[in-house]
Amino acid sequence: MAAKKICRNEKLQLKGSLKKNGFDRWRLVTNAVSSVSGEEKTFFIEFYAVNPALSPKECVLGFKNRFNKSTEDFQYVLPGSETAKNFTSQTYVSPSFFMIKAGVLSASANQMNSYFPPEILSAKKSEYIISAKQEELPACILAHDYTSGAIKVTDEDLRAHPEYMGSSGTMSWNLKFSRSISFSSDYRAKDINWAVLGGKTDFSGTIIFNNEEYNVNPRNSFGYYDKNWGRDFSSPYFHLSSSNFTSEISGRLLDASVFAVQGEYKNKVSVLVSIEGKNIEFHANKLKKKQISFDCQEMNGTEDEGLKLHWSVSVHDRRYVIDIDIL
């Protein structure tokens, strides 16, 4: 079957100087139901490429600095001399790696981070967006309308490499997807870009999480697919998205509705909303007159719940008023 045309923004964007000073991230989110217990969980799969040209053959993490002094240098530190005051035991290492991040969101959160040398990443074939071959596990692939792969992180891995962070576990997936609602305009800036490739994405297939099978049905997958790339991540980071709405007026499920909020972009957020076929877009980098406020605060829940997060976003202009309030 002929490969489907891949949107330009979906492709790997790390070209030119971004090869040594840039990142590219694809994120997919879907609900799935356990075939054993019937429990529903929200799963995520992310593909990361960071500074791939800096160290193609070796995975280098920037989370852990490296010792850059000799034994002779170190002896001056022991007596607490003046030299010790200017002694720097570690030096910053620019990261260079490809990573698969996968797991579960919400109360039963689990995040597995699996790192690889950048050279395993392939992005030059027309039939897929990116592919990463592994020695012992199936290749992790992201194409225009499907994704498949597997990752495994052991307790031994985390003890040997605490800089990996995250949790131990296994996850494999084989998913097809179609995007029913997208937003054509993206947030574009010098250091970071954001594209909502599938604000409402319908997934189908299976996920095996820690040896338990979960089924993904397109009718209730409530999927999401977006992408970030550039020179630096947003900090602080703010993100909300959903395609699971019920009308308070009619009580019916709004199948053709979605919202996505992301920032901070110079103390602003982009708010993208589609209500039953009508797109309403407020972009942080556009000069359109609008007022936007957003916040995320910790709140005390019940004894069983513990601390809760209260998210709020409010945006309005001359035509629209949109309030998002999530507990």
Regions found by a protein language model. Name each.
Residues 1-327:
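Structured soluble/peripheral alpha/beta segments that form catalytic or ligand/cofactor-binding pockets
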